[in-house]
Regions:
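Short, intrinsically disordered terminal segments enriched in charged and Pro/Gly residues
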Residues: 1-51, 98-106
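Residues immediately within or flanking Cys/His clusters that coordinate Zn2+
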Residues: 54-55, 80, 84
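Short cysteine-rich clusters marking metal-coordination/redox-active sites
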Residues: 58-61, 87-90
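Cys/His-rich microdomains that often coordinate metals
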Residues: 64-65, 94
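Short Cys/His-rich "knuckle" micro-motifs
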Residues: 68-71, 97-99
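Short linker/helix segments within small regulatory modules
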Residues: 71-82
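Coil-to-beta-strand transition motifs
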Residues: 78, 91-93
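Residue-level recognition of well-ordered beta-strand positions that form the cores
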Residues: 84-86, 99
Length: 106
């Protein structure tokens, strides 16, 4: 007859499984639009960036994101903005990328 796992062992296994799930979720989030500089979210104006960033839910818990900082870099295809955010509920850091490229007039 096998003994049931000790409480500490079960806790470690659960903790390991949660960390693995967080890493998998973060890896998938980097492939979403805005998750990396290679896949930025295109916007027409810089005024829209902060509102869109704050309106994005946390990838881990679905909570509201709080702006921590931003940085802009000029590229040939427009201005690339990196927005650093943190979740208000779980404090998970998140970086979103936006490309400010004004729409060309006809």
């Amino acid at each position: 007859m096998a003994k049931p796992p000790r409480p500490r062992r079960a806790q470690r296994e659960q903790s390991r499984a949660l960390r693995k799930q967080v890493r998998r979720t973060e890896r998938l989030a980097n492939e979403l639009p805005g998750g990396s500089p290679d896949h930025p979210i295109d916007v027409a104006s810089a005024a829209i960036v902060e509102g869109k960033a704050r309106g994005t839910p946390c990838i881990q818990c679905g909570g509201d994101l709080e702006l921590r900082g931003d940085r802009a870099t000029a590229t040939a295809r427009g201005v690339l903005r990196e927005i650093a955010l943190a979740c208000r509920r779980c404090h998970a850091p998140r970086t979103l990328w936006f490309r400010v490229a004004p729409v060309a007039a006809n």
